[in-house]
Amino acid sequence: MAKKMLIVHGYSDGSVSFTKLGDYLVDQKLYDKDDVYYIDYASMNDDATFKDFADKLNDDYNRIFKGERIDVVCHSTGALVVRTWLAFRLETQKELNQHFDCPVEHLLMMAPANFGSDLAKLGQSFLGKVRSTFFNTNSRPEDFLESGKAVLQGLEPASPFQWVLSQYDMFQDNYFNPKSQNDLICYPFIFAAGNNYGGSFEARLLKNRAKPGTDGTVRICGTSLNTRKLMLSFKDGKPVNRWYPETKFANIPFAVFDGLNHGSIINPDEEAFSRQAGPASLISKALSVKSAQDYENVAKEFETTSETNYGIMGADYRDKYQQFFFKVRDDVDCLVEDFFLDFIVLNETGERDNDLTSKFDDNFESEFYTHSADSAHRVMMVNYDKLKGFFETLVKAKGKLVFDLTANTPLADVKYIEVRFDVFDGAKAGTKDISFFYPNTTTLVDIVLDRKESDKLLNVKTGDEVKKP
């Protein structure tokens, strides 16, 4: 492990909330007291962005640590702050043709908001601003009636910011690449809380505090970095699909912990924190990783620990979920914000099966979330266990699940071709043949539509045609 540790808080929080965790790391003799550092950042400033935080963090890192490799623990929104910093630092070095370095050796993410929080939209409301101003001990006078608009838009499910950031650190040559030399590799680890705030007074006030598939704040499947990206390109309405090549680790350590929610997962005083299958059992192992082989071995331990936790969870928390994060654009890379995506089940003869279509709509399609500032980005979170059961039904019925996508443009002389894509054909494949369903993950789906322009928009003519009356 590195000699020094930096702890990064989440949205509307502050460093004072993390001193117990820092003291725990010192008590475990993982770091000396003087080598544990904390961050405070203005997450409730409406104008502050993740890039602002990343730039200042980079300056402070250079000033304090002077290029020394450090370890980082981050909570919730802090994960996006750190990932933005790492991406920003490397991209800057590339642009300026500077020497590459990797400032972070071990990155421990506690309940990270890697792919969204259902509370982020509420935080942008007037009620959210009042709460941030009058009921938050971390609020600042200069942020009066502010709640961090730019940060919260980045935190929303289906955030364009999350899409772009993922492109940097998961699908390009970045710090999570096992093929890099060892001192240019950052080893990330995901510690996800497995319980929400169900039954609490807060959950009675805010229903999303007890939303299934979440830890009361972030989506559990959205904490994982085991993300895949699929491009669906439609030329003349015909689909061509391609999985983006991955540069990151094939299996980033991920574990879900029973008995802990979004807030309590950072509290070492919690009984569930230190139990045999709790986070404490894996923190020291994560920090001891020195090579890609070590990392692979620890990833297996995370997986085993996660399954142990699922085995002792209550029925309300045991189901696993998956997110499908859609971005719709056209073949000239313009975002398509006005579109309708409809899932349909066809029977063996190719006709619509109304019963199975209704069953899919009732159980899955209602989970679509559209980003508040950019409707070209949408996400659907589905219960993986229910989805698997639905596909078993399709196999028995020899049915096919497809989606139809229709879209409009603001230009009357530009049209999009309506498209259809076969998601799963129960007559041809069994459930074991499903290639794009992975529990506790987010799958990015990049949909590219074919646009057609009329001659009224632009028309190339011959000389004779021009001279015709």
Give a label for each model feature.
Residues 1-38:
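Short, surface-exposed "cap/lid" segments of acyl-processing enzymes
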Residues 5-11, 36, 50-170, 200, ...:
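Serine-dependent carboxylesterase/thioesterase catalytic core
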Residues 87, 101-310:
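Helical cap/lid subdomain of alpha/beta-hydrolase-fold lipid enzymes
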Residues 151-155, 160-165, 352-399:
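Tryptophan-paired
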Residues 297-316, 404-469:
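Extracellular beta-sheet/turn segments enriched in Thr/Pro/Gly and aliphatic residues
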Residues 311-312, 328-335:
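Short amphipathic, basic-aromatic surface patches that mediate peripheral association
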Residues 322-330, 343:
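A short, amphipathic beta-strand motif
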Residues 332-353:
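Short, ordered, surface-exposed loop/turn motifs in non-cytosolic proteins
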